[in-house]
Amino acid sequence: MTDKLSKYIITVFGASGDLSKKKTFPAIFGLFKQGEISKDECKIVGYARSKMNDEELRDRLKPFLLKQVSKESNGEKIVDEFLSNVTYVQGPYDTDEGYQKLGEAYKEIEKSLNKGSPVNKLHYLALPPSVFGSVCEKIKNNIYVNEDDAKTKIIVEKPFGHDLESSRQLQKELAPLFTEDELYRIDHYLGKEMVKNLLILRFGNILFNSAWNKENIQNIQITFKEPFGTEGRGGYFNDIGIIRDVMQNHLLQVLTLLTMERPVTFDSEAVRDEKVKVLKAIAPIDHDDIIIGQYGKSXDGSKPSYLDDETVPEGSKCITFAAMNFQIRNERWDGVPIVMKAGKALDVGKVEIRIQFKPVASGMFSQIPNNELVIRIQPDEAVYLKCNMKTPGLSTTTKITDLNLTYADRYEDFWIPQAYEALIRDALIGDHSNFVRDDELDVSWALFTPLLDYLEGENAPEPTIYAYGSRGPVELNXYMHXHNYKYMHGDIYQWPVTRPDSE
């Protein structure tokens, strides 16, 4: 069940931090700009230890908000109107004093917002996980509300732990304080337009729904590529690595939506029940069936290696690229390789899904490419299906082409919300579908922790060095071939703009 969008105070904890300035406040502003929240029904409060007043916070936020309205003639006016709705409370995170001050600020806001009666509170914790427990305890003891028309909701940011043990410890701290209905664990990939579209694409189209199984699908790829390295943040990244950064969370969420069974309804609990079921069906990750890499200098020497980053410990084995195969032991997917790949400092920046179907029966055609469904999550959302067609003319030769749905070409003047915009709105209306449940989190860490222990142990394998700006480790193509992926056009898909002289 979801709530109607009612009166709220949204408090951003960590208001002076980078995440708040670059993501959280811009997302709330995006909802304001689109009319999803209004000054009459929603007030915004920033909370942090930094000593500043309302105007100083507004001045810090303004440049980031102006970027969103740079093409609008009245953009600055919209930004100023939003910022007039933002106030600031300064205080510590670990003592009651600041929260009591926050409570007094709430009372003043509620006088104008709801004639003095309590309103809903959404607390967005843009903070390190190490302080989640203590901050939540202070919220519960000082500013918690749970009435018919006034509820408390908490959004917490990833990472939700460093491994299975730390994740369970974090949950142990939060569980006595707030119910699952009050907690929203945010994984921003679940707010991306194409990720939210996966269930509609699968279950709303009979041609895909009926072919979505081991009888028809030969291979699935989930790919994350960044064209840049750690750029001076290697010291931070060194403690995380690419697997914790995007694979255990973002890409695993994509995998569950791709492979889960049809839920009974679109109710958030029904969707998350099916995600947990498919997670439990995944076999342990085979430590001998992975590729790990670390980027070196670019082939021309112009781009630095990971170890050239001054913040990186000497001789670090940190993994900046990984590819691994998932096997789902159930009736639908048993035997289908599902390869997850992610890396930094690669040739392009993109996130996409490739579902390659099995070849048609031999006999009529001597050789014909496999059909392939490609779902591009970013940049430039798109879905296209690679199909075989007759080449125009007298011959009966075939050519691969595509049925193409590129969002920018098909949907004009539509607002496609950014991930954080979509998820904050979901939290405001009480929709948990695109947030991570406690048991889901536990199963995902149970799947990845043995692999991480192996890769970070005393006998950890050496990552393969690959060139900055390349496609990744040289053994990647052979790895994909071994997992049933059939490349076309010299291993790189060519967009099908075909002319007679190119035959």
Curated annotation (Swiss-Prot):
GO MF term set: glucose-6-phosphate dehydrogenase activity; NADP binding
Residues annotated to bind NADP(+) 1: 14-21, 49, 158
Positions of NADP(+) 2 binding: 341, 350, 354, 376, 384-386, 471, 487
Classification via InterPro entries: G6P_DH, G6P_DH_AS, G6P_DH_C, G6P_DH_NAD-bd, NAD(P)-bd_dom_sf
Disulfide feature: none
UniProt keyword Oxidoreductase present: yes
UniProt cross-references to Gene3D superfamilies, sorted A to Z: Dihydrodipicolinate Reductase, domain 2, NAD(P)-binding Rossmann-like Domain
Protein name from the UniProt record: Glucose-6-phosphate 1-dehydrogenase
The species this protein was found in: Hanseniaspora uvarum
Gene assigned in the entry: ZWF1
